[in-house]
Amino acid sequence: MIAFIEPFLASKSLANNSQQAYRYDLRQFCQQVGQRINPETLALYQQSLSSLTAAAKKRKLSTVNQFLYYLYQQRVLADYFKMDDRIEASFSLKPQLTRLDTSAFYAETAFLKGQLIALLILELGLTPSEIAGLRLADFDLGLQVLRLQSHRGIRVMTLSRTLLPFLERAAEAQQLYLFDHDAKPFSRQWFFNQLRDFLESIGCAELSAQSLREQFILNEKAAGKSIIEVAQLLGLKSPITLEKYYKM
């Protein structure tokens, strides 16, 4: 079925970002169901989306349904299949923050810069402004640490083995900044645009730099870090703003 993805995309008028997102979702779908498209394989595919947000789930189902209709029109499929993409809304007086399945953040992508920005927020809790100021000299990939200097002092952060390959690829360039624009950092808006394009490509358009930072907090809390330790990792003067995460 993978062979039909490009002809399907060519039949639609899609912006480049949307086309990348469609391609990612459809390759994921084809890898899961293989050549057998039937009610059973589609049900298993739907079940695999259960951990996603409602918006991401609806987007993936809509994309796959369009693809299934295309395959039926092209007589690749003898029967027309359509998955129910209606997502029941759930309401709560108090929004509940939960840890997300972030495996898609580490998958192969065409949006490499946006991916690295997302991972730096997700794994280290950095803000876009802090990321903009990162220099290659701040990293010691051999010792797997980042030394981030600010007016409040130096924060030493451990780089995970999962993050390391993404940094090693970026460090191959001979430049001053991790994200370098003629030996100067890019604008803050550039970082938000790169992050947005990547998040859209993996079906997580509803996420933001702030929500990824919240994931970092939740993950550190789940790992047993105290509120004081997380505040120090984030470079905060006080842990007051973190109290809501520890009262959950």
From Swiss-Prot:
Keyword field contains S-adenosyl-L-methionine: no
GO molecular function: DNA binding; tyrosine-based site-specific recombinase activity
NCBIfam families from the UniProt entry: PRK02436.1
Annotated GO biological process: DNA transposition
Entry keyword annotation includes Signal: no
Superkingdom of the organism of origin: Bacteria
Catalytic residues of the enzyme: 213, 245
Source organism of this protein record: Streptococcus equi subsp. zooepidemicus (strain H70)
Name of the protein: Tyrosine recombinase XerD-like
Protein task: Putative tyrosine recombinase. Not involved in the cutting and rejoining of the recombining DNA molecules on dif(SL) site.
Domain Tyr recombinase: 92-248
Family from the record: Belongs to the 'phage' integrase family. XerD-like subfamily.
Gene Ontology CC: one annotated term: cytoplasm
Keyword line: Cytoplasm, DNA integration, DNA recombination, DNA-binding
